[in-house]
């Protein structure tokens, strides 16, 4: 199970790192980059998101108490549909955003059930996003300005991975 989480983490870091390197800045969100890709790239992005999500499934369903399995299933389902949405509709759309938000909410409910201390990572979100207001001309302030969705997605992902790896 740990191997699956490590592979998922490597794939997520490689994709995000490549996107940051390609654009020379943080993306607006993890999925924002898919809309700049050609059609074949959208298929690749969907396969990437599905792979990262499916590699999390066995450890997630093994770790979460049986009574709450439906919440984990809702999280995984929302992630899968979020990955497929760019193929269904070519442009940014409300369904994609709603599914992403719902996946984030379900992921944090799962984290609260598995190991609630990982929800403390949201303090990191407040610190990072607060830097935009405290030092807007500072290096961190300039880097994250307008990137709140990406930072929130990163915190969701880190809390899920942390709760699964260290449980």
Question: What feature does the model see in each segment?
Answer:
Residues 9-17, 46-57, 105-115, 126-128, ...:
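Hydrophobic cores of alpha-helical transmembrane segments in multi-pass inner/ER membrane proteins
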Residues 1-65:
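N-terminal topogenic module of multi-pass integral membrane proteins
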Residues 4-7, 45-53, 68-74, 96-103, ...:
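Physicochemical signature of membrane-embedded alpha-helices that form the seven-helix bundle of GPCRs
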Residues 1-5, 57-70, 109-121, 165-167:
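Helix-coil boundary and interhelical linker segments in multi-pass alpha-helical membrane proteins
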Residues 69-125:
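Membrane-proximal helix-loop-helix units in multi-pass membrane proteins
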Residues 13-22, 81-87, 129-135:
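Transmembrane alpha-helical segments that form the membrane-embedded catalytic/substrate-channel core
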Residues 115-167:
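Terminal transmembrane helical module of multi-pass membrane proteins
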Residues 34-38, 61-68, 89-95, 137-148:
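Membrane-interface helix-boundary motifs at transmembrane edges
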């Amino acid at each position: 199970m740990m191997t699956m989480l490590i592979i998922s983490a490597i794939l997520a870091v490689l994709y995000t790192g490549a996107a940051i390197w390609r654009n020379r800045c943080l993306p607006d969100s993890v999925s924002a980059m898919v809309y700049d890709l050609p059609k074949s790239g959208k298929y690749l992005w969907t396969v990437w998101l599905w792979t990262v999500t499916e590699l999390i499934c066995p450890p997630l369903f093994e770790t979460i108490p049986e009574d709450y399995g439906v919440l984990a299933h809702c999280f995984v389902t929302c992630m899968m549909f979020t990955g497929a949405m760019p193929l269904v509709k070519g442009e940014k759309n409300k369904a994609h955003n709603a599914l992403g938000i719902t996946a984030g909410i379900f992921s944090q409910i799962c984290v609260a059930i598995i190991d609630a201390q990982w929800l403390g990572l949201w303090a990191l979100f407040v610190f990072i996003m607060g830097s935009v207001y405290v030092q807007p001309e500072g290096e961190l302030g300039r880097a994250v300005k307008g990137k709140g969705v990406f930072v929130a997605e990163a915190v969701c992902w880190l809390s899920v991975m942390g709760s699964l790896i260290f449980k």
